[in-house]
Amino acid sequence: MTAHASIATPGGISLATGRDVRLASRSGALTGSTAGFAPGFVQANLAILPAKLAFDFLRFCQRNPKPCPVIGVSEPGDPTLSSIGLDLDIRTDVPGYCVYKDGVLVDEPADLKAYWREDLVTFAIGCSLSFEEALMAADIPLRHVEKGVKVPMFRTNIACVPAGPFAGPMVVSMRPMTPANAIRAVQITSRFPSVHGAPIHIGLPEAIGIKDLSKPDYGDAVEILEGEIPVFWACGVTPQSVISAAKIEYALAHGPGMMLCTDLKNSALATG
Amino acid sequence: MTAHASIATPGGISLATGRDVRLASRSGALTGSTAGFAPGFVQANLAILPAKLAFDFLRFCQRNPKPCPVIGVSEPGDPTLSSIGLDLDIRTDVPGYCVYKDGVLVDEPADLKAYWREDLVTFAIGCSLSFEEALMAADIPLRHVEKGVKVPMFRTNIACVPAGPFAGPMVVSMRPMTPANAIRAVQITSRFPSVHGAPIHIGLPEAIGIKDLSKPDYGDAVEILEGEIPVFWACGVTPQSVISAAKIEYALAHGPGMMLCTDLKNSALATG
């Protein structure tokens, strides 16, 4: 992933580890996407919600583990999350954030200092960057990475199992592959249930309500070549989509592509 | 597992499926252990807690997935759990229950009709019977099954990651195996992260605070033969032990060995 070689960072700053990226985000040195940085370290989606909704949301995640694989949950009001990052401060350690009120995006601040509340709970949710690293290590090409664009994502007709106010369709990401690579990708990603796990669908987009693969709902379209089939994974955009649809009075999230870089290693997530 | 062939059930009653066992429990026809019944179906540990503690407990489980693999969570006050069992009624569908007040066992009723409250949340937690079935299918002998006794369980010096009032040591189960079978057992149980997953320790009991394998804290001792090593899995007794230690004002659970039999198939839990 070389798409972000152009991101301006002060000369000599290291972005080799999750903590490096967090500190660079905290200092303001890193303001864009985290893709390609902290190789080997788990990057996570963020959902930050009032404590009164925390059990509903965690129950939603338990019921929908493929789109919503939880890798860390904070204590209510506590901006640290030491189980996944040394001296992590969730208010500053991501390059940028989104602030939602009643489901509407109202601000995209560089930090959450003005938006933090004593009743907030942070959920860190696994992200496909972890399994993409394992796929690339197995020499499975990923077209969106090769082209330097965002992975194409689609809303499906697969309903998530609801919990409290949280409900809605599963969002999936799509990667075109040769059949042989698709089979190998099933094997590899099955070892990573805490970062979306095995594909949820393969080969027949219309069967999950996707009419046109050239028109993704999020991200960028990629070409499907002769002899390739589309492979679909549950996507971490699902919880964001569900939180927005629920018109939660107050919710915070990471900015697009600006993930929380943790101290966990992708390799440590493999179950077998 | 033939240990329960002697359990008295009315002539002709089938205990072949999870629902069969639930209905037999509901009617009072089945009053003992569920081991050996509903082969192929997931059996679960139960923890039933007041809603005000539900987020703390679910967060505890998220932080300790090996001893506390959650397979279902109810809506507050709702005695059904349709995601894991058709027309399941948690108040009646287990052969027997335990009632704890302030951490003390105060009753062992046959049903929860007199103990149900509108603020209770049910947690169904995976159980080693699921992975034991996979081990036996691979011709790996399990001594406690051969001997018709309970698996030996030990408190360790491994601290669970706390959440709210829930804290305490991990409890493990032990199965002696030849080294070749131990390796195969790691492979097989790694595929089942939602029912405790891979072993948490192998070979050196003193390293996890176990002084004497002949004196389990729960269950029955089993012999370790020449050429065998002890293999340890995180155990679903851990959440019970933690709930009891937290002296929760009101908590319900299944009776020993009397599990909630679900409609889920063990084979469906495999991640790869």
UniProtKB/Swiss-Prot annotation, chains A, B:
Enzyme class at the top of the EC tree: lyase
Cystines in this chain: none
The keyword Cytoplasm appears for this protein: no
GO molecular function, one term: lyase activity
One of the Pfam families matching this protein, by short name: D-Glu_cyclase
The protein's Enzyme Commission number: 4.2.1.-
Domain of life of the native organism: Bacteria
Keyword field: Lyase
UniProt record similarity statement: Belongs to the D-glutamate cyclase family.
NCBIfam families in alphabetical order: PRK05463.1
Name the record gives this protein: Putative hydro-lyase AZC_4080
